[in-house]
């Protein structure tokens, strides 16, 4: 979902990924939580609180979102200059990136992409 942000608004690729990453991870959590929980100790270290897979997944996603905040990066699409009326166009264009979407652990439709952009807005 990062590519259309760069294509339309010239947002640097790393920033465009940071803007959508927590939301994409949240979307994928229903199928990828065990993988995210496995990564949680590597990201959080001693800050990881005890809990099951879902709790560790939430902590992992939260830690990645917090990294953007602590880095001073914009954390919402609106903060990066994306107009709200462009979200449907971004979702449509994101569906053109099939070489990337096929690697996503959960099938993503245009409606899913739009919902993610709306949450990220």
In which residue ranges do the predicted regions lie?
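Generic hydrophobic alpha-helical membrane-segment signal
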Residues: 1, 10-11, 97
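Short alpha-helical scaffolding segments that buttress acidic/His motifs in well-ordered protein cores
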Residues: 2, 21, 64, 68, ...
